[in-house]
Each structure stands twice: as structure tokens, then as C-alpha cells.
Amino acid sequence: MNLQKFPRHPLTFGPTPIQPLKRLSQHLGGKVELYAKREDCNSGLAFGGNKTRKLEYLIPEAIAGGYDTLVSIGGIQSNQTRQVAAVAAHLGLKCVLVQENWVNYSDAVYDRVGNIEMSRILGADVRLDAAGFDIGIRPSWEQAMADVKQAGGKPFPIPAGCSEHPYGGLGFVGFAEEVRQQEKELGFRFDYIVVCSVTGSTQAGMVVGFAADGRARRVIGIDASATPEKTHAQILRIAQSTADLVELGQDITAEDVVLDTRYGGPEYGLPNEGTLEAIRLCARQEGMLTDPVYEGKSMHGMIERVRNGEFPAGSKVLYAHLGGVPALNAYSFLFRNG
């Protein structure tokens, strides 16, 4: 496997810490050891997150090509767009963000706090669009790029989640390599890795990276899209193309993409009672915050898999905390009583 042939522009602090979740592990019976890899603490750029790791492999192309405007898309409370806005500010580039109405959630401040507030503070041109949720290429995003061109700019396209970019999976191939190095220092290997999946390139990169040591199927994706067939297909497609890019030397099959579909409901961006219970439990056991859109759902999935005995006794499970906490303010009504 050859990740080193791809240029990388550092946007993160370096390897993210691995934190033992001792109290949560004991609360859930003590038979499974839980750990968290803190991608939510990976950068000083507007709280960072998993997209910042991905952007390290996209940005060299933008710089080398003389692009002057980063153009991205997401929901109103997109973490992706906030991270793109931060990177643009850091590099002295312009930024146009399309924020679509991906979530059927009504709150008076939903489009004024959290991620979108930060994007505006960072100087991005934020454009609200009424279109609903979809993980594919969006007409509104294509129109934003056309607008930049018409105004004389040179737009660099960054799709939702970085996932449709050919290099979107590379950052999390690097994540797997980073974990392997940390495992040497820890003196043990993780038996399972739990990660939230929506647009797919985070899990896809992990599948490729961990396939190098035989653990592709130990990457447990927890679907938060509530459109799991589309998400599974996109993860597989991205993983296969990423495997070719990094010269993995083995095929990635549909069976290598493990996606647990039980925790994504009722729909994208809307938590269920299990999501909210998991957010509170993790916060009160570990002081670690998760969000109702992504990490609360993957935390719920991990907790239930432990409770149900789906991880064998003695397993060491690594939870990939991808970020997402800046969206909490947009859901303040749900937590008005804690």
C-alpha cells in the first residue's frame, strides 16, 4: 500500500489521541474495553473534525492549480462546510457554501447557531437552499461553482463529506496507518473500530486502510443516513477506487463493508430516544460530548452492541469520534432539561 505518493497539506495537529473510556466500559458491564480516537480534537481550525483530515489530501490540488475559491455543500448544520470555511480562511482563499435543508427539524435558531454561525464568522458566502437530503452530486452545488466562474473566480469543488472527490478516502487510509503505529505503543491491537457513516468516504478509507492487516470487516459502520442502501453502495464504490489509488493489492468486496442499519432512524439529522440516551450517558460517564446527527447515533450503536453481547468478551473496541459537537446548539430544545 502506498499512501505516501500523494501530497498532503498539514491542517491537523498530528496523530489524534486515543482515550480509554473506562467509566463507560464499566457501566456497560466491564466485559468490553472501549476507547475513543479523538478526531474531534484534531485541529485548531474551527474545532476540526474528520473532514479536516480528508481535506489535507484535497488541498494540495487546490493550491497547485491556482484555485481561489473553495466551493462546498452540506446541510444547514453541516460540519463539512464549517471545516471547509475554516481551511479557506487559513489559506487566504474565498469560500462559497451551499447549505441545503437536509433535516426535517424546526427550531427558531437552527440556521443561526452552531456550524453555520461559525461558517459566517469565518467569512464564507453562505447560501441557503430548500433542497432536501441526498448524498450525491447536487445541482445547487454545481450552480454555485458556475456563479464563481461567471464572477471571474476559479472554483475548487469539494463535494459533500469530500466523498465524491477521488481523494476523499485517503485521509482515513492514513487514519488506519496512524492507529497501527499507536497500537505498537499501546502494546495491543483493537478488535473492532466503530464509525459513523453517511456520505461514505470516512468508512471507505478505514476499510481500505485496515484491509492491509486483515481487519476490513472489523470496521463497523453505524449508518446515520437512514438511506443505508445508498450509503453502503457509496462506501463500497469509494473503497474500491481508493484501494486502486493506494495500490492495496487486494479486492474490496461488498462483504468488506459492514454497515449496521439499526440506529440511523427516524431519518437523517433527527435523533431517536436511543440517540439522546447515548449522548447523555457518554457525557455523564466520560465528559465526552457527541451530537444528535452523527456521533450520537454511532455511540448509540456501539453501546447497544456491547449491551447485546455482539462484541465478544475481552474485545477492545475503538470508537472513532469524528466531531459534530458544534451542531449541539441547534438542537438545544431537545436538551432543555439536560
Swiss-Prot record:
UniProt keyword annotations, A-Z: Hydrolase, Pyridoxal phosphate
Co-factor(s): pyridoxal 5'-phosphate
GO process terms (BP): 1-aminocyclopropane-1-carboxylate metabolic process; amine catabolic process
SUPFAM superfamilies named among the record's database cross-references: Tryptophan synthase beta subunit-like PLP-dependent enzymes (SSF53686)
Reaction(s) catalysed (UniProt annotation): 1-aminocyclopropane-1-carboxylate + H2O = 2-oxobutanoate + NH4(+)
Residues the record marks as active site: S78
Annotated EC: 3.5.99.7
Example GO molecular function: D-cysteine desulfhydrase activity
Modified residues (N6-(pyridoxal phosphate)lysine): K51
Highest taxon of source: Bacteria
Homology family: Belongs to the ACC deaminase/D-cysteine desulfhydrase family.
Subunit structure: Homotrimer.
Role this protein plays: Catalyzes a cyclopropane ring-opening reaction, the irreversible conversion of 1-aminocyclopropane-1-carboxylate (ACC) to ammonia and alpha-ketobutyrate. Allows growth on ACC as a nitrogen source.
Protein name: 1-aminocyclopropane-1-carboxylate deaminase
Organism of derivation: Acidovorax ebreus (strain TPSY)
